[in-house]
Swiss-Prot record:
Residues 150-187 form a coiled coil. Belongs to the CFAP36 family. May act as an effector for ARL3. Residues 166-194, 229-250, 282-322 are annotated as: Disordered. This is Cilia- and flagella-associated protein 36. The gene is CFAP36. Residues 179-189, 282-292, 300-322 have a biased composition (Basic and acidic residues). It is found in: Nucleus; Cytoplasm; Cell projection, Cilium, Flagellum. Interacts with ARL3. The lineage of its organism: Eukaryota, Metazoa, Chordata, Craniata, Vertebrata. One of its GO terms (cellular component) is axoneme. Signal peptide: none annotated. The keyword Ligase does not apply. Keywords: Cell projection, Cilium, Coiled coil, Cytoplasm, Flagellum, Nucleus, Phosphoprotein. The modification Phosphoserine is found at residues 85, 147, 201.
Amino acid sequence: MAAEEEDEVEWVVESIAGFLRGPDWSIPILDFVEQKCEVFDDEEESKLTYTEIHQEYKELVEKLLEGYLKEIGINEDQFQEACTSPLAKTHTSQAILQPVLAAEDFTIFKAMMVQKNIEMQLQAIRIIQERNGVLPDCLTDGSDVVSDLEHEEMKILREVLRKSKEEYDQEEERKRKKQLSEAKTEEPTVHSSEAAIMNNSQGDGEHFAHPPSEVKMHFANQSIEPLGRKVERSETSSLPQKDLKIPGLEHASIEGPIANLSVLGTEELRQREHYLKQKRDKLMSMRKDMRTKQIQNMEQKGKPTGEVEEMTEKPEMTAEEKQTLLKRRLLAEKLKEEVINK
């Protein structure tokens, strides 16, 4: 007898579960829930509208169940026994019987309607996103928007900081290259100045080396024969050989009229020697003065040239460029602080 009752309860449960999974039940219930779930939210307070909708739902469930139970011959007691049986307590059975239980329990009904409302919203958002490729601003969460804006600002800040650092590094590299270029240009200038001084010194030496020869030739061409006739040979022979040395003529070959110098008197030779010595000293002084003037001229000419090169290679920054550079550095420092603080 108990086995027959269990079999009967099992049959009733399976029969009801089959009906609840069928279109005769699922289509009208689903249509009602989708149409009425729009007003439901997850607030704790229950509105009057919720109660009215729940009453409508309860009437719909009773109508559908009564029609089915009459059709298969199940009375109300059998139905209640099947719903309270252990077979109806399983997880699968509870999921199937939830729409029926919601008709009797408002809490279950409200939770079901809120869940359906959320599912409908998510489905609508998914359809819009699939059609347009992006969601409108009105459907995005405020916190997500702020997060995206902050993320975009961080990207911009990092990019500005990177560009500022690159510009600063380029400026430093340009200054370093200018310093190296100036060092290279100054070194050849110094060498060229020294070479020019040496060349001028050699030129001065050659220039002043000629006058003694000219003096020698001029002195050699002078007619000294009349003087030789007035001087006695005995006096000439007794003159020391060292007194015959004339500046600029020590290494000159004695030939032609110059050989007649031996007949000159001692006093005359000394006068000649003194005269030539004065000339030599004067020429040496002139040579020294000219060399000094040339060095001074080269220094004076080299100084403006260096200044021009320095001005050309080192153009001073304008006030606007200085202000721009200062702003960049301040912005870089501010961005670094903000990035570090964040």
